[in-house]
Swiss-Prot record:
One of its GO terms (biological process) is phloem development. It holds the Pfam family Myb_DNA-binding. InterPro entries: Homeodomain-like_sf, Myb_CC_LHEQLE, Myb_dom, Myb_dom_plants, PHR1-like, SANT/Myb. Keywords: Activator, Coiled coil, DNA-binding, Flowering, Nucleus, Transcription, Transcription regulation. Disruption phenotype: Differentiation of tracheary-like elements of xyleme at the site of the phloem pole leading to seedling lethality. Transmembrane segments: none annotated. Induction: Up-regulated by phosphate deficiency. PANTHER family: MYB FAMILY TRANSCRIPTION FACTOR APL, MYB FAMILY TRANSCRIPTION FACTOR PHL11. This is Myb family transcription factor APL. The keyword Manganese does not apply. The keyword DNA-binding applies. Expressed in shoots and roots, specifically in the developing protophloem sieve elements. Detected in phloem and/or cambium. Expressed in the phloem tissues of various organs, including leaves and cotyledons, during vegetative growth. Transcription factor required for phloem identity. Has a dual role both in promoting phloem differentiation and in repressing xylem differentiation during vascular development. Regulates the expression of the transcription factor NAC045 (AC A4VCM0). May activate the transcription of specific genes involved in phosphate uptake or assimilation. Promotes flowering through transcriptional activation of both FT and its transport machinery component, FTIP1.
């Protein structure tokens, strides 16, 4: 019915018509209204060599590739499309390389961040430790200062108590010393008055130690000497009392106060003096009134020696008269009284502060 060879013959003719080979260039072109180039293996190898010579698909351009290949009938359209496909064929490798580099950089960045985080954590930890150490040391320093302040305050209180006790002790000692001095001073003044009076006056004479007036008139010159020594003895006693009063007031005056106990009237009442003796005693009393300090011990010893000599003379005379008529009563010579404690070894009288006599 239908013949089978016709379609086959038609298909064969179509294939022959579609593929047209250019003998000079060796290109295989289709017979379509828009002829298309068939990239053979040999042509592709020449394209790859040209791209490699030009520095890779990124640097190669269609014009440079066409000039390097030198194939007739090859147009820019053919090279442009094939170059684009070639670039797309090479892109997965590039993307893989870029991805690997990006992953590496990302990993390195993460490592860096991790290291930075760890280092920052270590730094923050170190800073916290340092801050805690500083706070601990400050707390210890504050504790030490507080203890030191407490010890200083305790030491100050202790020193204050010691000073108060010392002041109280000194005040008590001063009061006790003042009381004792007042007590001793009162007793000493009383004893001083009695001792000075007893030392100046001496023990009371025996009633038989002085000769009667009849004996004094008999002996003549001896009587005058006895009166002179007696008068001088009273004057020394008065001068001693006056010296005590002057020492009590610590003021040296030209004249002394008159003593009512030992006045001229009393002496005149005791003994009757002649005019010559009266003038002599008056002159001596006037001279003695202007004296301030007297050597008491020397005068007392001189008076006692002179009195002892007078008594010895009288005893000798009375012995001679006893052979003729009657024996007179013998009188022992008065003993020399020891030096008073108020007199110093040099013969001077230590003047007292107060005297019971005016």
């Amino acid at each position: 019915m239908f013949h089978a060879k016709k379609p086959s013959s038609m298909n064969g003719s179509y294939e022959n018509r579609a593929m047209c080979v250019q003998g000079d260039s060796g290109l295989v072109l289709t017979t379509d209204p828009k002829p298309r180039l068939r990239w053979t293996v040999e042509l592709h190898e020449r394209f790859v060599d040209a791209v490699a010579q030009l520095g890779g698909p990124d640097k190669a351009t269609p014009k440079t590739i066409m000039r390097v290949m030198g194939v007739k009938g090859l147009t820019l359209y053919h090279l442009k499309s094939h170059l684009q496909k070639f670039r797309l064929g090479k892109q997965p490798h590039k993307e893989y390389g870029d991805h690997s580099t990006k992953e590496g950089s990302r990993a390195s960045a993460m490592d860096i961040q991790r290291n930075v985080a760890s280092s920052s954590g270590m730094m923050s930890r170190n800073m916290n430790e340092m801050q805690m150490e500083v706070q601990r040391r400050l707390h210890e320093q504050l504790e030490v200062q507080r203890h030191l302040q407490l010890r200083i305050e305790a030491q100050g209180k202790y020193m204050q108590s010691i000073l108060e006790r010392a002041c109280q002790t000194l005040a008590g000692e001063n009061m006790a010393a003042a009381t004792a001095a007042a007590a001793v001073g009162g007793g000493y003044k009383g004893n001083l008055g009695s001792s000075s009076l007893s030392a100046a006056v001496g023990p009371p004479p025996h009633p038989l130690s002085f000769p009667p007036f009849q004996d004094l008139n008999i002996y003549g010159n001896t009587t005058d000497q006895v009166l002179d020594h007696h008068n001088f003895h009273h004057q020394n006693i008065e001068n001693h009392f006056t010296g005590n009063n002057a020492a009590d007031t610590n003021i040296y005056l030209g004249k002394k106060r008159p003593n009512p106990n030992f006045g001229n009237d009393v002496r005149k009442g005791l003994l009757m003096w002649s005019d010559q003796d009266h003038d002599l005693s008056a002159n001596q009393s006037i001279d003695d009134e202007h004296r301030i300090q007297i050597q008491m011990a020397t005068h007392v010893s001189t008076d006692l020696d002179s009195l002892s000599e007078i008594y010895e003379r009288k005893s000798g005379l009375s012995g001679d008269e006893g052979n003729n008529g009657g024996k007179l009563l013998e009188r022992p010579s008065p003993r020399r009284s020891p030096l008073s404690p108020m007199m110093n070894p040099n013969g001077g009288l230590i003047q007292g502060r107060n005297s019971p006599f005016g």
